[in-house]
Regions:
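Cysteine endopeptidase catalytic domains of the caspase/legumain-like
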Residues: 1-296
Length: 296
């Protein structure tokens, strides 16, 4: 539920708004341990430093996430400071990053109507079978694209819609670089090579937007593991440690987070920052030492 704004809750004259989403209990993909804890802890700390935070625990399905994003977008006024955080499953497909809601469906099976183009091809004919495999894979790729567009949330679209409201800055944090494979059991039953019938996630793609600060938990094209023995992800562990640091620019905070993650992972996990800020000296907690705080 959204936190109520109170007099003096926001530091300085600019409002601070945050939408924080963490999804653990996926219906059709591996359940995760950290996202819900990460979202709850981050929300609490953001509220403590003056953010108006929306972190409803009911936001899980595609319809709920899309409605919440729309409501959040419409709440943004020019010159607000905006923070968006998502933890859960995410996937890159054809250069776009998609955030997966709780009810993201299984890989769709190919039915007989989809295979009508290859009727009559003999499985004994090696050349024709290769043609059949190619056609099946093309059909599968189209189905993946269609279902992602209809049932997953395009991260770049969220970033664009938030930025279109003309906020002072958009801070966009994604902790969803987990590896998995979109499997098509129907193709495997037909004997199609698993390297062609299953589509492996390749991590997230870099994102850009003027006026935004974008941070991924790991570098584009790489992955992180869920940490079932720990309450928080490695990225969140260090974000929680640094985000309330007074008198520190947000870019420096995220660099400290990056250094901490790299140290703890022996450089196996490298967070990625994309900085296209229009303003300098953005402090989330306190004013810069002897500097003009552009946040105010």
């Amino acid at each position: 539920m959204a936190a109520e704004a109170t007099p003096g809750a926001a530091f300085g004259p600019r409002r601070r708004l945050a939408l924080v989403i963490g999804i653990n209990d996926y219906e059709n993909y591996s359940k995760l341990t950290n996202p819900k804890n990460d979202a709850e802890k981050l929300s609490s700390l953001l509220q403590n430093i003056g953010f108006i935070v929306d972190t409803s625990s009911l936001v899980k399905t595609y319809a709920e996430v899309m409605r919440k994003v729309l409501d959040f977008q419409l709440s943004i006024e020019p010159n607000d400071v905006v923070l968006f955080y998502f933890a859960g499953h995410g996937i890159q497909w054809e250069g776009q990053n998609y955030l997966m809601p709780k009810d993201f469906p299984k890989f769709p099976e190919i039915n007989e109507a989809d295979l009508k183009e290859i009727d009559g091809i003999s499985e004994k004919d090696i050349v024709k079978k290769k043609i059949a495999d190619i056609l099946i894979k093309d059909i599968s790729k189209k189905k993946i694209s269609d279902i992602l567009k209809m049932k997953a949330v395009n991260a770049q679209d969220i970033l664009n819609t938030l930025s279109d409201r003309k906020p002072y800055v958009t801070i966009f944090l994604l902790d969803c670089c987990r590896e998995y494979i979109l499997r098509n059991p129907d193709l495997n039953r037909r004997g199609v090579n698993s390297n062609t019938s299953n589509f492996k996630s390749t991590g997230l793609a870099a994102m850009h937007k003027a006026g935004a600060l974008i941070a991924f938990a790991c570098a584009p094209g790489t992955f992180v593991d869920d940490r079932p023995k720990d309450k928080n992800s490695l990225f969140m562990k260090h974000l929680l440690e640094h985000i309330t640091t007074p008198n520190e620019d947000i870019v420096n905070i995220l660099r400290d987070v990056t250094n901490g993650v790299m140290k703890d992972s022996n450089d196996e996990q490298i967070p990625f920052l994309s900085v296209q800020l229009r303003h300098n000296n953005i402090y989330l907690c306190g004013q810069g030492r002897g500097k003009k705080n552009d946040f105010e």
